[in-house]
Amino acid sequence: MVLLAGTGPEGGGARCMTPPPPSPPRGAQVEEDPADYEEFEDFSSLPDTRSIASDDSFYPFEDEEEHGVESAESVPEGVPESVPETATLLRAACANNVGLLRTLVRRGVSVEEAQETDRNGRTGLIVACYHGFVDTVVALAECPHVDVNWQDSEGNTALITAAQAGHAIITNYLLNYFPGLDLERRNAFGFTALMKAAMQGRTDCIRALMLAGADVHARDPRRGMSPQEWATYTGRVDAVRLMQRLLERPCPEQFWEKYRPELPPPPEAARKPAGSKNCLQRLTDCVLSVLTPRSVRGPEDGGVLDHMVRMTTSLYSPAVAIVCQTVCPESPPSVGKRRLAVQEILAARAARGPQAQEEDEVGGAGQRGRTGQEDADSREGSPRAGLPPALGSRGPAAPAPRKASLLPLQRLRRRSVRPGVVVPRVRVSKAPAPTFQPERPARKGSTKDSGHLQIPKWRYKEAKEEKRKAEEAEKKRQAEAQKERRTAPWKKRT
């Protein structure tokens, strides 16, 4: 898991503070100065609040939400924006000018402008995928006229270009947020995106394409070789091992909603008692364990390390549930199964209607209630998938833009303890002066009339204390009497 933290508006979160004023004298009434505290209600301005939790699922930045969802409100009508006359969508994409690109998209782009190509027949999306311009690809996703399956003069699409170049983030973004993407589109030589990634040894792109449903058994028309055979032919050992591993275990079971983080049952060999082996077998096992180096053994399938990886990468893991959100926990990715884009999944749920969504939620709640208290506690803070009720009321007739799937985090937290959006208010106090001495509260002489609890007094302790005081008084009286008897007679006469 890779976290890419963005820089804050003040340079990595550094905050310049003025030196604190001198501390007031003791005993003086001190009033709270509003300048001594800073209250934060919008956490988007703080540093380290923008992150990409994974390459294939992440929320957009705040400015992307404003441009993608509230574009009509952010740009007033009748106010022209400063855009050069020669600026086009293709030039802005080639120059990686994200600000100009978003401005052009908000103002409206025709089909001819969106499909403008260079001398090699490449559109702005293909150029951005070739150079690895992630922000440009995200900005082009807002344009409704961009053809994701456009082929250049050599027949390469945006997906083939990104997979061949090894841009894993762009490849995952194309697979997740561009509806209608053709995974099996071939170029002029008959190669698919998976074949090109296998030839170049792009393991991250191979994993993303195979889990998205790319055809592993497809063959090119000239040599008739599959992607795995092309990886073997070009000497990509890591790619061959990865593809073989994915074919052996095509579906990650920890991404299922029904997955339980339980230890696997022990194998049959471990269940047999030690006394079932004879002397020769035990001697052979002892010699083999001594002569075999333990460092050579790798992680075993179904072992402790494998179980730890499954638990930490599951949907209900604390490391994943607090930063990631999935829209289809009931259908995890699998090799050979076509995975739909986020917009297509949300459109299918919206077409079912709010009543079907409520039935799914009720059924999921009943299923969660049967899992036990431990599973309920582990899932209490995990984000759940599903369309919010506000989106379900729109109906299938409402046009779903591409950025509509990237919902704000507060709109997806529908199972919170408090209803609605609860924004905490953080109050940060400044550090006092080095010479400041806190004033200690004066102790009260008696606590009889106070509202606090008092220490209980036991009767035997009170009697013991009274007896001790009486003995001390008797000793003092006897000492005074003895002192008077020792006084000289001539002093008494006077």
Swiss-Prot record:
Sequence ranges of Basic and acidic residues compositional bias: 371-382, 440-451, 459-487
Region (Disordered): 1-80, 349-494
InterPro entries assigned to the protein according to its UniProt record, in alphabetical order: Ankyrin_rpt (IPR002110), Ankyrin_rpt-contain_sf (IPR036770)
Sites bearing Phosphoserine, chain numbering: S405
Biased composition, class Acidic residues, residue ranges: 30-42
Positions annotated as ANK repeat: 84-113, 120-150, 154-183, 189-218, 223-255
Coiled-coil positions: 459-488
UniProtKB keywords: ANK repeat, Coiled coil, Phosphoprotein, Repeat
SMART domains per UniProt: ANK
Pfam name, any one: Ank
Gene3D superfamilies (alphabetical): Ankyrin repeat-containing domain
PROSITE patterns to which the protein is assigned, alphabetical: ANK_REP_REGION, ANK_REPEAT
Name of the molecule in the record: Ankyrin repeat domain-containing protein 33B
Gene that encodes the chain: ANKRD33B
